Amino acid sequence: VKVSGEDPIVSTTGKASRELFEVRVANGQSHKYDFLTVGSMGHASMIAYGLSEQLHQGKIVCVDGDGAVLMHMGTLAFLGKQQPKHYLHIVLNNAAHESVGGMPTGAAGQSYAAIAKACGYPKVFQVDNASSFVSVLQNAQAYSELTMIEVMVKLGARDDLGRPKETPQENKERFMNYWEEHTK
């Protein structure tokens, strides 16, 4: 979130959105920049695409899970064809559906970065540690083309991971107010 600044983040359902919410709290940042895709696994990438079509500067950051991408794999081909210029797609790959019990996705060993490249993403990266992720993420802010960063992560979340303190309706309204100002 430090690298994204005031750029909007659309995050997938489940623990990724919960982590994002808690990071904003820990950093004393507003939640207005974030659209938490609660209860809509696989739809964050297309919501982010729709927003990217209205954006003239900055980035749309989509934080997705490997299971969510797998559920709507055709989105990668669609995005590769459309080539949104302001779109940064981050895929957290733990080879499992973490938020619904950690069941394996059945796609362990598959490279989402390679799949995205085959679908037409001009820039793709796969990282497996925090320092590489930060470096690639900082560089990606300067790219004016569709970019994917696949982040290989371990299965497991903190036991004390909280939940957003606002309702999905409140999140949507706050984000829409921010978006209206951001795209003027």
Task: Tell me what each language-model feature is.
Residues A16, G42-H43, N129-F133:
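Short acidic loop-to-helix transition motifs that present clustered carboxylates
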Residues G5, V23, A142-K184:
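Glycine/aspartate-rich loop-and-adjacent alpha/beta segment that forms the canonical ThDP
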Residues M103-N139:
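Conserved thiamine diphosphate
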Residues R18-N94:
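Thiamine diphosphate
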Residues T13-S17, N94-A96, M152-A157:
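Glycine-rich beta-alpha junction loops
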Residues L20-R24, M73, V100-P104, D159-P164:
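Short acidic, glycine/serine/threonine-rich loops at helix termini
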Residues P8-T13, L36-T37, C62, F125-D128, ...:
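General beta-strand structural signal in soluble alpha/beta enzymes
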Residues V1-P8:
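Active-site pocket-lining segments that scaffold enzyme catalytic pockets across diverse folds
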